Amino acid sequence: MNISVHEACHSLEAPGALLRRRGGSPDGLVAYVRALLGDQMPADLEAFYREGVEAVGDFRAILPKWNERPEWRREGMLRALLPVQAVPIFSDGAGSLYGLDLSSGAAGPAVYFFDHGDLFERPRWAAGSSLAYLLLLLGRYDHAIAEGCPAGWERSIDPDIESCPRAPPIWRAG
């Protein structure tokens, strides 16, 4: 079953797991990131920006600071993963990043965890087979920990997580 970024966001709103940005049109932000990526913006990334996601649970979204005045724009962490063909999507709150894969050219690219301890040189583990599935997994993360879910609980939400090409899922990453 495939799920869109919009559907994932909608399903996270009811339990209050999703926080959205207030105000402002995403058009300038989308155009800015598209230009930064050389017009190679995955549809899921554009949908994510258009949804206005600020956080899912404790995971803060990584967004460039958009302003109509070019001299007031800031990329923030947006360029941090470009050398390894990824765009940062979320921070784990401890310096590591979740990044959307740009190397595959896939319509719905996977998302990987990049550890700051590795200096973001490679993906450490697969975090979701798509951005939509990552959103659902992040929304369930605290509950899974609190409930003591076994390794691999992510498969119940994201059945394709084990087929991500650049890194294994967390329970196989060692």
Which residues make up each language-model segment?
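Extended hydrophobic/aromatic-rich secondary-structure runs
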Residues: 84, 127-134, 153-158
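Compact, glycine/acidic-enriched structural inserts
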Residues: 110-147
